[in-house]
Structures are given as C-alpha cells and as structure tokens.
C-alpha cells in the first residue's frame, strides 16, 4: 500500500529514572539498569509518497543522508521487504539532540512502525525488534513500549511495568550537546557497588507517598557531566530549589528533569528556565505515548 496522502506522526522523547552502568562487555558496550519514562516532548514526522527515499529536516545541523537514523530505518525495511517505491520524510525537529532524551531513537522507531504498515511489509515484532536494536539501544523502547519500562542489557532488554509517572515532569535542555561517547569515556566507574533493584522499586513509586525512594534513582553519568558543565549542574540546583521532589540528569545529558507534585510550581520553574532561553517541556502525571 502506498502512502496516498501525507501522514503526520508524533515521536515522543523519554527520560531516564535512575541509570546504573553495571559493567563493560568484551565488545566495548556497557550494560546498564534503568527506567525509561515517556515525556510530552516530541518531534513530528511527515510521510508522503515518493519514488525514492528522501529526507528533509527543519534543523540544518542534522544530516539527512544515510547517516540519519530515519533514512537507515527506511532502507532496512525497503531492502527487507523488496519494496520498489520510496518515501519522502520531513522531520520537524523539536526534541534537542545530544540531550539524553532519545529523540533520534524515537524518530527511527516511528519510521519502522509507520513504513512496516504502509509499505505492507508486515514484519513480525521479532524482526522489527532486531532491526530496532541494530539502529540503537534505545530504539526498541520507543517501538514497543508506551509507559514506564525497565531496561537492562545495553538498554534493549525491556520489561513493561504497566505504570506511568504520577508527578508533573519538567524537562530542561541547558543548551549543551553532550555526546554519548564522551559521557561513557568520562563517567566514574562504580561496577563493584551493589545497586538498588530499579525494576523492583518502580511499582512503589505512586502518588500515595513513596517519594522517599526517589533519591535511590541515581544517574551514573551525573558526576562527570556536572564537573564539566556547570550550567547543567545549576539546572538541577534550580529545580530542587523550586520545590522538585527529585531532579536528575536524563541519560548522558545534558537535559535535566524535575518531578513536581503541583502544576503551579512546575509552571513557575518552567517560566524561570524559559527566561534563561532554555527549551523546556511539561509532562502531566500519567502520561503515556499512546495517542
């Protein structure tokens, strides 16, 4: 089935609630333990029929050639399904890149999901998962999950926790682009430490008073990132000073989020961050990626 009329889809971002780097494998990859939670910050992807795979983007700093994850995802499906037609993709880039929010991974997952249907390839969930992992460790989450999920392995071993975050989430981008490679090269190793079981702790995070558990959800990248980027550290300080129950770096940064019980406090700190010209988003309690 060709895409007869332009199709527009949101590709939501995520934050990490806790992120423990557990070991370095022989192949150079690091294993981790983390929780992924969706946030109401998204890119918009538009698809229309074309003779070849074409890509354009509203952000001129992002490549639109075969190094782009969206293009790679489209080519994987085209080759696997023996598809003759192409697709024109327009990426309205709203989620900051180099922020630890998984925007590029979410975009790639959206391409896999949309084109698998509209090219009538109808790959199984197992095959789609395999393609997702080949594109990036975060991609399977955006392809398969909707709410809070536990991730192990390199981030690709997922468990749906069938729950959502019960607080307002304010997510701030301090205008620093931090590469994942830099973060892994500078984080302070703590492999020998016994770490909390994030998967077991997650169900206890509810609106009925388990906020005392939140400090257990540390991010192993924080100390190295905060040492190098003082403005990123300051965002966490500001969020906590504004009444956040908890604040943390997301992924390898530079985005920082705060969890708030009340909407008014969340909106006040949003205004303060916007006054610094920092992009910011507000996610309501109970948010999921189901549209």
Swiss-Prot record:
- State any single GO MF term: ATP binding
Q: Does the keyword tRNA processing apply?
A: no
Among InterPro entries, the record links this protein to:
GHMP_kinase_C_dom, GHMP_kinase_C_sf, GHMP_kinase_N_dom, IspE, Ribosomal_Su5_D2-typ_SF, Ribsml_uS5_D2-typ_fold_subgr
Record: residues binding ATP: 96-106
Q: Domain of life, per the record?
A: Bacteria
Q: Which residues form the active site?
A: 14, 138
GO BP terms: isopentenyl diphosphate biosynthetic process, methylerythritol 4-phosphate pathway; terpenoid biosynthetic process
Q: In which pathway does it act?
A: Isoprenoid biosynthesis; isopentenyl diphosphate biosynthesis via DXP pathway; isopentenyl diphosphate from 1-deoxy-D-xylulose 5-phosphate: step 3/6
What EC class is this? transferase
Report which reactions are catalysed by this protein: 4-CDP-2-C-methyl-D-erythritol + ATP = 4-CDP-2-C-methyl-D-erythritol 2-phosphate + ADP + H(+)
Give the EC number(s) listed in the UniProt record.
2.7.1.148
Q: Which UniProt keywords apply?
A: ATP-binding, Isoprene biosynthesis, Kinase, Nucleotide-binding, Transferase
Read off the HAMAP family from this record: IspE
Record's function text: Catalyzes the phosphorylation of the position 2 hydroxy group of 4-diphosphocytidyl-2C-methyl-D-erythritol.
The UniProt entry, under NCBIfam families, shows: ispE
Family, similarity comment: Belongs to the GHMP kinase family. IspE subfamily.
In Swiss-Prot or TrEMBL terms, this protein is called 4-diphosphocytidyl-2-C-methyl-D-erythritol kinase
Organism, by scientific name, is Chlorobium phaeovibrioides (strain DSM 265 / 1930) (Prosthecochloris vibrioformis (strain DSM 265))
């Amino acid at each position: 089935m060709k895409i007869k009329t332009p199709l527009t889809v949101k590709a939501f971002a995520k934050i990490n609630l806790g992120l423990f780097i557990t070991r370095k494998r022989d192949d150079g990859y690091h294993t981790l333990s983390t929780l992924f939670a969706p946030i109401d910050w998204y890119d918009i992807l538009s698809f229309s029929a074309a003779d070849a795979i074409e890509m354009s983007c509203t952000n001129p700093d992002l490549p639109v050639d075969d190094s782009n994850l969206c293009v790679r995802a489209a080519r994987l499906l085209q080759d696997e399904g023996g598809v003759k037609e192409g697709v024109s993709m327009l990426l309205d880039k709203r989620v900051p890149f180099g922020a630890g929010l998984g925007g590029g991974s979410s975009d790639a997952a959206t391409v896999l999901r949309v084109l698998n249907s509209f090219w009538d390839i109808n790959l199984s969930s197992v095959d789609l998962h395999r393609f997702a992992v080949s594109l990036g460790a975060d991609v399977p989450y955006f392809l398969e999950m909707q709410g809070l999920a536990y991730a192990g392995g390199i981030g690709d071993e997922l468990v749906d926790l069938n729950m959502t975050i019960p607080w307002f989430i304010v997510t701030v981008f301090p205008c620093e682009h931090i590469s994942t490679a830099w973060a892994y090269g500078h984080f302070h190793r703590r492999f020998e430490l016994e770490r909390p079981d994030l998967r077991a702790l997650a169900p206890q995070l509810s609106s009925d008073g388990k906020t005392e558990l939140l400090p257990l959800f540390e991010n192993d990248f924080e100390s190295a990132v905060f040492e190098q980027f003082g403005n990123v550290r300051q965002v966490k300080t500001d969020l906590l000073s504004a009444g956040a129950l908890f604040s943390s770096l997301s992924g390898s940064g530079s985005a920082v989020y705060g969890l708030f019980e009340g909407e008014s406090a969340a909106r006040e700190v949003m205004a303060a961050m916007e006054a610094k010209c920092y992009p910011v988003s507000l996610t309501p309690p109970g948010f999921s990626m189901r549209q």
